[in-house]
Amino acid sequence: MKAVLKHELSGYFHSLTVYVFGAFLLVFVGIGSMLYNIQQAVANFEYVLGFISLIFVGLVPILTMRVLAEERKQRTDQLLYSLPITTTDIILGKYLALLVVFLIPLVIVAFYPLIFAKFGDVYLLTSYGSLIAFFIMGAALIAIGMFISSLTENLGMAAGICVAVVLFNYYSVSLADYISSSVIGSIIALVVLILIVGLIIK
C-alpha cells in the first residue's frame, strides 16, 4: 500500500491536478470568507464552508475520474494486479493519495479562523467542527468518485456520472418531496434509479 501511495502522490505532484484542485478550493474559500466573514462581519466560519460545498460537484469528478478509469484504458491495471500486493492495498493506496491531495489545501484553510479571531470574535469550536465535517464529506464523495471511475474506462463518462451522483446527493432531500412515501412508491423509485444507473454504466 505504501508503494502505491508514494507512486500516486509522485504522479499528482508532477502534474497540474493537485495544484489546480488546491488553487480552486482556496480561491472559493477566499471568496466565501470575503463575502461572509469580512464584508458581512459574520463570526461563523461554517457559513463559508457551507457556501463552497457545492464546488465538490466540479472538483471531485476532476480529481477522481482518472484514478481507475485511466488504468483500465491504458491496460496498466493488469500490471498493478500482477504485483505482490492485494487489490485492497491498491485501492487504499490510491484513496489515501487522493485524501492527502484534498487535505493539503484544508490545512491552509485551518488557519483562517485563527487569523479572523485576531480581528474579532470567531466561534473556533464550531468552525473546526465544520471543517472536520467538510473533510469527511469530501472523503465520502471522493470514495464515490473512485467507485464510479472503476466502472468504466471512459474518462468523460466517469466524470459525467460522478457529477450526476454528487448533484443527486445534494438535492436528494428536495427530490424526496416528489416521491411517494408509501412502500410501493419507494420501491418503484428505487427500481427506476437502479435502471437509470445501469443504462448509464452500460
Feature locations, PLM:
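Helix-loop-helix units of permease transmembrane domains in multi-pass membrane transporters
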Residues: V67-A97
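Hydrophobic cores of alpha-helical transmembrane segments in multi-pass inner/ER membrane proteins
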Residues: F56-L63, G138-A143, L190-L199
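Alpha-helical membrane-protein architecture signal
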Residues: K2-K6, T88, L92, L96, ...
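Transmembrane helix segments
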Residues: L35, L155-K202
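Secretory targeting signals
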Residues: V29-Y36, Q40-I55, A97-C162, Y170, ...
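Residues that define the loop-to-transmembrane-helix transition and helix capping
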Residues: Y19, T88, L155-G156
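Transmembrane helix-loop junction
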Residues: H7, G11, E70, S82, ...
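Hydrophobic alpha-helical transmembrane segments
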Residues: M1-E70, I200-K202
